[in-house]
Every structure is written in C-alpha cells, then in structure tokens.
C-alpha cells in the first residue's frame, strides 16, 4: 500500500513540475525566428539584393572606403522562402514572426488563469505532502 502511495506521489510531483510552464516561451520562439532570419539574410544576401536598385557612384565610392559602416540594407522580400514559411508563423495565433519587434508576440497569461493555476498547484503539493507523510509516518 505504501509503495502504491509513493508511486502516486511521484507521478503527481512529476506532473506538477511538467505543468509548471513551457520549456520555451513564445518570446523565445519569436527571437529565435528573427535570429535565424538574420543569419540566412547574411548568407543569401545576393538573392535578396537582386531586386534592389543599383548603387550610385557616390554609394560605390562610400562602399569601397567604408565597407563596414556603409553597407546597404538588403531588400526584404517577404514572399521569399526564408520568410514565407510555415515555421515563421505562430502555431496558434498564426501571424508572422518576422516583425521588427519580437515583444509584440509575448504571450501574457491572464491574472485569473495564473491564480487558478497557483491554487491547483498548491492543492497538488498539499496532496503529495499528505500522501508522503501518511506513507512514512
């Protein structure tokens, strides 16, 4: 009987810690998508710059003298495969993750659901504590 209670307590503790929150937040998903887009941006710079207007003489002169500071930003084509891809969309709300500010996509848990979750977790911890104390005392 005590072994049965210990197994139930271990399962309850595992469920509590597993349900305490996602391993990766929506904010991290957005920033990772942005970081990946910027990495692929640098790799496929020529394919994106193909639709940009040609450099003027002064811009060419500047780019020769100040290669690091005056680099033109690539033309951003959002129908390019690196942007228009199912992985760049939010799994539930389905809006694109290539927005300039990832803070738009931060998932805010409501106070009511947070309060309910805290009460449930406190109840589970109380039940596990009493099961363990009954098993060992």
Swiss-Prot record:
Its main location: secreted. It is a single-pass membrane protein. This is Secreted RxLR effector protein 67. A motif (RxLR-dEER) lies at residues 32-61. The RxLR-dEER motif acts to carry the protein into the host cell cytoplasm through binding to cell surface phosphatidylinositol-3-phosphate. Effector that partially suppresses the tobacco programmed cell death induced by cell death-inducing proteins. It comes from Plasmopara viticola. GO terms for cellular component: extracellular region; host cell cytoplasm; host cell nucleus; membrane. Belongs to the RxLR effector family. Keywords: Host cytoplasm, Host nucleus, Membrane, Secreted, Signal, Transmembrane, Transmembrane helix, Virulence. Coiled coil: none annotated.
């Amino acid at each position: 009987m005590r072994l049965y209670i210990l197994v139930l307590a271990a399962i309850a503790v595992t469920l509590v810690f597993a349900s305490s929150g996602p391993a990766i937040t929506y904010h991290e998903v957005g920033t990772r998508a942005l970081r990946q887009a910027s990495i692929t941006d640098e790799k496929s710079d020529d394919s994106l710059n193909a639709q940009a207007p040609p450099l003027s003489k002064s811009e060419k002169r500047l780019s020769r003298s100040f290669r690091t500071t005056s680099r033109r930003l690539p033309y951003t084509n959002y129908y390019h495969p690196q942007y228009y891809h199912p992985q760049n969309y939010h799994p539930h709300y389905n809006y694109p993750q290539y927005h300039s500010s990832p803070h738009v996509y931060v998932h805010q848990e409501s106070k009511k659901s947070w309060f309910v979750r805290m009460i449930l977790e406190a109840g589970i911890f109380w039940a596990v504590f009493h099961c363990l104390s009954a098993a060992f005392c």
